[in-house]
């Protein structure tokens, strides 16, 4: 791949561009050069769209607390600089940030949907792209915060908050050392695997799940698709998690096909003996498939994640 290109975004006019979207627009279609868009501290209030074929883009901030991409679209009310025929409608089109370009990286960025509680589906970011990685990022919202729609994604040291189905979609995702915060009652995940032949699913590895101080109000997940697959391994769960753990989305047939697994989790919310009978604890040999990076980086002769982790470009580069 060609030499990395650096551009800087600053809302005060001191950078190469004043808006994140202007910087993205400068990247050519079919891009093969890693383009690092360095975001100066600030709250960037506009919807952001990374189109298909604008690949190898990095968003880099100094700290997620002071570098925020935010907008307030909901599934029922979308204001965007792109037409609905481009970004979609409803939940699919309402993301504050929409990423469709492959090999995307974000570091030290907050992705927020600022629509208030009770607004319905309000996505902070939708990722419809392969080989994407997020490091030390925050994802803020209420319902449907993080839409991991399609492709393979890796999240490390991230903070994700919400209430209803706030990590959802049908990608293959590994979330490692992440903090999952449950703001009010609902469901953490809604994974939508449609067939047992699909390799998709969400793995939470060495994560921490916290709540708002109340007990027993949050489910670990429910199957948006009949074969929804979620694995929690070596993860701390506080008392916000309901003892039963999982929900069938009002359809008993889902209990025959959903794949909801736990492995060596701990904390007051990890009541494995009281879980619904159609979820289960993995055996050691079964867990091996899920607790390694190969879950999202399966091709040993064409690895992407190990290379990605070695070529991260810090903000100061």
UniProtKB/Swiss-Prot annotation:
SUPFAM superfamilies: Pectin lyase-like
Reported function: Acts in the modification of cell walls via demethylesterification of cell wall pectin. Acts in a blockwise manner, resulting in a cell wall rigidification.
Enzyme class: hydrolase
Site location (Transition state stabilizer): 143
Record protein name field: Pectinesterase 31
Catalysed transformations (reactions): [(1->4)-alpha-D-galacturonosyl methyl ester](n) + n H2O = [(1->4)-alpha-D-galacturonosyl](n) + n methanol + n H(+)
Gene: PME31
The species this protein was found in: Arabidopsis thaliana
UniProt note: pH dependence: Optimum pH is 8.0-8.5.
Pfam families: Pectinesterase
UniProt pathway: Glycan metabolism; pectin degradation; 2-dehydro-3-deoxy-D-gluconate from pectin: step 1/5
Note: This is the only member of the pectinesterase family that do not contain a transmembrane or a signal peptide.
Tissue: Expressed in siliques.
Regulation acting on activity, per entry: Does not require salt for activity. Not inhibited by kiwi pectin methylesterase inhibitor (PMEI).
């Amino acid at each position: 791949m060609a030499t990395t290109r650096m551009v800087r975004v600053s809302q005060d006019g001191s950078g190469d561009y004043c808006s994140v979207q202007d910087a993205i627009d400068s990247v050519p279609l079919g891009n093969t050069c890693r383009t690092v868009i360095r975001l100066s501290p600030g709250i960037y209030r506009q919807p952001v769209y990374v189109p298909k074929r604008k690949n190898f883009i990095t968003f880099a901030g100094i700290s997620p607390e002071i570098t925020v991409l935010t907008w307030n679209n909901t599934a029922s009310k979308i204001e965007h600089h792109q037409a609905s025929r481009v970004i979609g409608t409803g939940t699919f089109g309402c993301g504050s940030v929409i990423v469709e370009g492959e090999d995307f990286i974000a570091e030290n960025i907050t992705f927020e949907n600022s629509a208030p509680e009770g607004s319905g589906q309000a996505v902070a970011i939708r990722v419809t792209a392969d080989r994407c990685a997020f490091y030390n990022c925050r994802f803020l919202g209420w319902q449907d915060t993080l839409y991991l729609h399609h492709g393979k994604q890796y999240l490390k040291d991230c903070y994700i908050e919400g209430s209803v189905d706030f990590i959802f979609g049908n990608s293959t995702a590994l979330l490692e050392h992440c903090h999952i915060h449950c703001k009010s009652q609902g469901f953490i995940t809604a994974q939508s695997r449609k067939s047992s032949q699909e390799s998709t699913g969400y793995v939470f590895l060495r994560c921490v799940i916290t709540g708002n101080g109340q007990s027993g109000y949050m489910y670990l997940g429910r199957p948006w698709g009949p074969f929804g697959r979620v694995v929690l391994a070596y993860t701390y769960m506080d008392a916000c998690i309901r003892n039963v753990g999982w929900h069938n989305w009002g359809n008993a047939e889902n209990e025959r096909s959903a794949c909801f697994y736990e492995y060596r989790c701990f904390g007051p919310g990890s009541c494995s003996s009281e879980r619904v009978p159609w979820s289960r604890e993995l055996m050691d040999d079964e867990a091996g498939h899920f607790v390694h990076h190969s879950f999202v980086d399966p091709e040993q002769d064409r690895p992407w994640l190990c290379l990605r982790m070695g070529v991260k470009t810090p903000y100061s580069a």
